[in-house]
């Protein structure tokens, strides 16, 4: 119904925890996107092995379905913070080839997202907030410059050139 009303993306949320059927949930989401020639934006908060399995399944689906290339955004993707450097490199190469985007809130805390590593491997990394009143975190301001600042503090060696490069995240 939303697609017929003009939505540009079909979305989803934590296919294993919320839906209890990861493959069925993702297959349905991708099929709707294919039926309407639209993009996919899934909010994946799962950090368990189920989150890694969901990321791998989505990448494999895009690899097998050329019409989905450049049309998948994985928001949050916290499962990537559970991978080692070599695993991130391998997955990032596949994601870059398929033009898969990672949208991050640049979280701080126990999870350290490999955002710089993903970007260095050619993955498009963008930022956002869940809303101005962030229901997931009391620290949400809805300020993209604040996200670029946080990214710079976490991932960039401080010099003028490198700091100016952090603005990609806010623009």
Can you say where each PLM-predicted feature lies in the sequence?
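Histidine/acidic residue-rich metal-binding segments in metalloenzymes
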Residues: 2-73, 79-100, 110-127
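Electropositive phosphate-/nucleotide-binding environments in soluble metabolic enzymes
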Residues: 23, 52, 85, 89, ...
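His/Asp/Glu-enriched, well-ordered alpha-helical/loop segment
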Residues: 60-72, 116-171
